[in-house]
Amino acid sequence: MSAAPVRFASGGRGYDTRNCVGVTKEAAMEKLGVIGGMGAEATSYYYDQVVRHTAATCDQEHIDMVVLSKSTMPDRTLAIKTGEHAELLATMKECARALESLGCAHIAIPCNTSHYFYDQIQSFTKVPIIHMPRESVRYALAGAVMGECEFDPNLSMPAEPVHKIGIMGTDG
């Protein structure tokens, strides 16, 4: 009887312990930290997506997560536009270190705008922070490069080759 699949996040990728050589059960059960609240709905949506894309057959097979919902985080767009980001970065540092002290193996930040400060935030902690925009590009390119993706469909990789990618953006 094969073990039930267990997925964990690492650099934005999910791994199945049945099919991933070198992944131990301990590694599969690493804790994911989330710096959220910058868009409470974005945090809620991210949490929902992690749960939906975890191959779990019971509650105990889900990823342990610490969600730090910091709705009072200083405005990211204002920090970008004015260059006044000391308070924002101090708060991000506090959050990253809190998640590190709680034993999180990886940190996700569902707020895309926060990734403008990714390098500074990453410098505050030894815990790898998942760079969501880069992972989105990796996801899109996987379909374009692979032709037909050979990735696990449970990871929601593109089923068809990607021929065009649209980009929308703002000043912050």
Functional labels for PLM-detected ranges:
Residues 13-14, 25:
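Intrinsically disordered, glycine-rich low-complexity segments
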Residues 24-172:
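Non-catalytic structural scaffold of enzyme domains
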